Amino acid sequence: MKQHPTLFLVHFVATAAMTGLIWFVQVVHYPMFSDIPAEAFLTYEIEHQLRTSSVVIPFMMTEFLTGCYLALRSRPLLSGRDLMLFRGSMFLLAIVWGSTFLIQVPLHEELSQNADPYLIDSLVCTNWIRTICWSMRSLILGALMVQWLIIKE
């Protein structure tokens, strides 16, 4: 990591930001969807998608692009066990993206047409995939960062 510590730090910060955001969404935001009156829900859902996208897209793209660069061009930035851990964290990121575009986005599209309580429950339940994966990524990347800052310096 000595050659590109700033890039790794940017990657870690983007991941940590998404981890904090996803926990807020999981514990506060999505569960409150069921409290929105049915007559206001469709408008709310569309506005939610627009506003949320403007916050998460920059972080998700930063995380994805810096992660891909580090995973593909990591030697000698990362090697051995550290490289394996980092690539494992990228596998978790692939799960996050898969869950986002194969599960959460379609659920939001359905919710923008129909304020079905079952769809809201599905959104909350399936969002645990992303919450757990981003949390694990933060732990892995945080451990790598601490190791780099404390042990290797």
Segments from the language model and where they lie:
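Mid-bilayer segments of alpha-helical transmembrane spans in multi-pass integral membrane proteins
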Residues: 94-102
